[in-house]
Amino acid sequence: MIRVRLVIAQCTVDYVGRLTAHLPSARRLLLFKADGSVSVHADDRAYKPLNWMSPPCWLTEEPGGDSPVWVVTNKGGEQLRISVEEIEHDSSHELGVDPGLVKDGVEAHLQVLLAEHVQLLGEGYTLVRREYMTAIGPVDLLCRDESGGAVAVEIKRRGEIDGVEQLTRYLELLNRDSVLAPVKGVFAAQQIKPQARTLATDRGIRCVTLDYDKMRGMDSDEYRLF
């Protein structure tokens, strides 16, 4: 069974790797997932962590007197060093097997159609893979642009802020992969809300409006009978 560990603790957090980052002492939620990922959360930023370590990574504990240090190390030698001052809650739970996100019919069909006609994203675009799996879920499409750069594409029927946030999380994770980086983002939807477009533009994510009716009229190998 899949187990997740939730810890609420007064702690400081230091990231040591290609760069350094420090979070001063505060009460935070520490999330340890069965896939090996570790994330540090505050009571804001919605679901976006303050810092995290993607799998594979390993947790060890160093003695630190009154403040033990939990050290999370990934295969590249980067570390999250969590100095635990006080633990208020520590529990583990079995979540079972998750069925995964089920897209509605239109979104699923948009993904199929855009994968077949990826040139709608731009001249020279090629498809690498549909449902490109990451530690936090599948990216709808992973493509290459005309210059060979990696592009992550998130597809929605209605483009709202939560979709931009989802793509942002994928991009932050994918850009840690030295093989893929730098990875650009495209937010594609039938309709994109103004607030979502503004947020995407601010984060360097390109928005593409999809004409579903026109795309359905295109020649499709998947749905051809003869």
Swiss-Prot record:
Belongs to the NucS endonuclease family. This is Endonuclease NucS. It is found in: Cytoplasm. The keyword DNA-binding applies. CDD domains: NucS-like (cd22341). It comes from Mycobacterium ulcerans (strain Agy99). Pfam families: NucS_C, NucS_N. Its main location: cytoplasm. Coiled coil: none annotated. InterPro entries: Endonuclease_NucS, NucS_C, NucS_N, NucS_N_sf, tRNA_endonuc-like_dom_sf.
